[in-house]
Amino acid sequence: MSGIQPVPGAKPLSMWQQYGPSEKTVRGIVIGGITGGIEICITFPTEYVKTQLQLDERSATPKFRGPIDCVKQTVNGHGFFGLYRGLSVLLYGSIPKSSFRFGTFEYLKSQAADERGNLSPVMRLLCGLGAGLSEAVFAVTPMETVKVKFIHDQGLAQPKYKGFVHGVGCIVKAEGLGGIYKGVTATMAKQGSNQAIRFFVMETLKDWYRGGDNTQPISKPIVGLMGAVAGAASVYGNTPIDVVKTRMQGLEAKKYKNTLDCAMQIWKKEGFFAFYKGTVPRLSRVCLDVGITFMIYDSIIEFLDVYWKKQQ
């Protein structure tokens, strides 16, 4: 329930106004979805390289010598757009993921903010955590599982997936619906910690920059810089979780009993630094990703605020 109460003598509130989500929550859902679609089209190549490196397990003859070599081999073998293989799968997931993330955060923030619209440090962390868990369960886990399997499949000599629908059908047929929820525990841990760190850092930097005055504007380059800092903090905070999640969602996930077993096998067979495999491409991707995401999100909100005020 939105908590909106009718004013005596005023026009009766509709069912949507009384029981539906608040305006900020709806804006978070819609604008978040638009933001997610734009952002993933810009940053996908680094996501592709990161995933390829994490799936390239240590062996006597590793396929890639690093991120640059991965890019070279991909472009030489498939052309420039080879770096965009699997984009459609991630695009299908990025829009709902971003919608759940920002919609949930805006809802939780509206419930936890003080009279000036600011969050306490603990609430920043908890609202970010809630946003991450929401996107993990409802969007990230199924779509990331499909994405990782697609990218892994495209690296094989004879790919078996002919397209998004065919690929999902093959996965469900072979593994059941549970096949697209492989690694859900690791994904919840990853997304929860990711967004807890990012929103905490972002809201803290914004509050510091504004001096506690929530009405003060922040230029878009500064928002982008804050987003990059928040992204970098999340990378160093949870890359090990990301590595385990990727292994659990790959085509060879069946060799692991569960998330803990996957982590133990990586530790025993590959050592501590295997948990930070793919950090360089992930760092560049995430800093760019988070910076762009918050810039786009804030820009669309400002644009719509001006438009809506003109309509009133």
From Swiss-Prot:
Residue stretches spanning the membrane? 29-49, 75-95, 126-146, 164-184, 221-241, 286-306
One GO BP annotation is: mitochondrial citrate transmembrane transport
Asked if the Swiss-Prot or TrEMBL record annotates the protein with the keyword Phosphoprotein, the reply is: no
- Record-level GO cellular component terms: mitochondrial inner membrane; mitochondrion
- What organism does the UniProt record list as the source? Caenorhabditis elegans
Q: Where are the Solcar repeats?
A: 23-111, 122-208, 218-303
Q: Is Nucleus among this UniProt entry's keywords?
A: no
**Topology with regard to the membrane?**
Multi-pass membrane protein
InterPro entries per the UniProt record, alphabetical = Mitochondrial_sb/sol_carrier (IPR018108), Mt_carrier_dom_sf (IPR023395), TXTP-like (IPR049563)
Q: Which Gene3D superfamilies match?
A: Mitochondrial carrier domain
The family this protein is said to belong to: Belongs to the mitochondrial carrier (TC 2.A.29) family.
Q: Where in the cell is it found?
A: Mitochondrion inner membrane
Q: What is this protein called?
A: Putative tricarboxylate transport protein, mitochondrial
Q: Name one GO molecular function term.
A: citrate secondary active transmembrane transporter activity
The protein's job, in short, is: Transport of citrate across inner mitochondrial membrane.
Name the UniProt key words of this record, in alphabetical order. Membrane, Mitochondrion, Mitochondrion inner membrane, Repeat, Transit peptide, Transmembrane, Transmembrane helix, Transport
